[in-house]
Amino acid sequence: MQKNIQFLRKLPIPMDIKAQYPLKPEYAAKKAICDKEIADVFTGKDDRLVLVIGPCSADREDAVLTYIHKLAEVREKVKDKLIIIPRIYTNKPRTTGDGYKGMVHQPNPEASEDMLEGLIAIRRLHTKAIEETEFFCADEMLYPENYRYLSDLLAYVAIGARSTENQQHRLTASGIDVPVGMKNPTGGDISVMLNSITAAQHSHTFLYRGWECVSSGNPLAHAILRGYVDKFGGSHPNYHYEDLMGLYKDYSARGLQNMAVVVDANHANSGKKYAEQPRICKEVLHACRHSSDIKSIVKGFMIESYLEDGSQKVCEHVYGKSITDPCLGWEKTERLILDIADLI
């Protein structure tokens, strides 16, 4: 008998949570159109860029929805150049295991963990974003078994730097129908990321949520460059011209489908200096103008932004200010979105 774990309660299966907050038929039809548009970017049929943009973590429903409504206002101004995919990141990997782990753990960041309420809260938030703004959003797949709770709502899925080498993440990604971005690991080994993409693009038989499953492979699995950390804990970028050319060479050698990279402008690429994100995006666009190879694989950016600049402790209660990594505030975010559209 195991003594170090308690099984508290059986949680509802995804079908039950989906029935509680269903995707209405009219939005299912709109999602099919949205999915096609985003897929066309990653397959090279559409020369727009995607912006996966939003808070580091979705900490409270009202502030996240306020932010997404602001994105909806900007969307009309840039729709010919950009496809905006809001980030609603509802579960957060923690380097040491401590700290806020996201809405799926704590729908109220100041209350005790409640994963039943968390599963309901994340489904409700994604559904509200769709119904109020017609945005289908992105989330990080921290727990592969939880993906099914949101599988009909998400337009984009990210695999984090600490998860990209994990077999269950790779195999689950191979059965997902929308683009899945694989981040380079925290140590920076690009081959690990490319191995992850290779695995996700192939068919597999595997165990998932108590079932024996067969996936067909995800041709839209692709790379995310997020910088890396050396053995001393120092941050190093990997978005420069030389990095992108090196990725193009290594990617090409793999013979993978739909070569694509999204550049994460924060994390180790910025050294978590959130105000550097506009400069980083502009440098990558400059590289695209100077190399057709780089331009052919750069499909967009991942940007951390919220209503207010910076970050805060949970107890400070500043509306729309991150309680995890520092984010770009709204005024700078709007300016950046418009600038990116102008530079394409």
List each model region and its residues.
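N- or domain-start disorder-to-order transition segments that initiate the globular core
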Residues: 1-45
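N-terminal beta-rich core of secreted/periplasmic extracellular enzymes
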Residues: 27-40, 44, 74-85, 91, ...
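Acidic (Asp/Glu)-rich catalytic clusters
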Residues: 42-45, 72-79, 127-132, 215, ...
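Conserved phosphate/anionic-ligand binding catalytic regions in large, soluble enzymes, centered on
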Residues: 50-63, 325
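Conserved, mostly hydrophobic/aromatic
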Residues: 54, 263, 329
